Amino acid sequence: LKIVYEDAYIIVVEKMQGLLSVNTERQKERTAYTILNEYVQRSGRQFRVFIVHRLDRDTSGLMMFAKDEKTQHTLREYWHDIVTDRRYVAVVAGEMEKDHGTVTSWLTDRTLYVSSSKYDDGGSKSVTHYHTIKRANGYSLMELDLETGRKNQIRVHMQDLGHPIIGDGRYGGEESLN
């Protein structure tokens, strides 16, 4: 983890791809949360970190941690007001037909995967806007802008479009670029 910003209330780190954000039932160690907490304890500081949000294991990007519970609560409560720009870049299989568009579906978290429905079946409504940056050699470079932030939303929506993210075996993507 690389610390990119720190003040009296928050720490922002750059999480690498392949690292879980937080502990799960099966993975208790070597998460962004545990690594940052170990760093704080080793440095002799008098606080611990509190989780504000998560990124998927296969997503790299910036993560924010609070230094106290009050800050954590405030950031979580107003997260959608504070974070107005949630854009991601991904390489997907196939050359996208459209330059831009929107995917809307209802996502339901199952045990091993997130399922998607075009109709409200009790899942959480999710909306992803996409823009095709470049097409080449059977792949597309995409900019993905989340209107909502559901678990595995981008992964599921790209699969729904028939263009799974490269490296995402769970949702149909190839292992790597050929």
Predicted features, each with a name:
Residues V91, W106, H131, E143-D145, ...:
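Residue-level recognition of well-ordered beta-strand positions that form the cores
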Residues I11-V12, M63, H129, L141-E143, ...:
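Structured core elements
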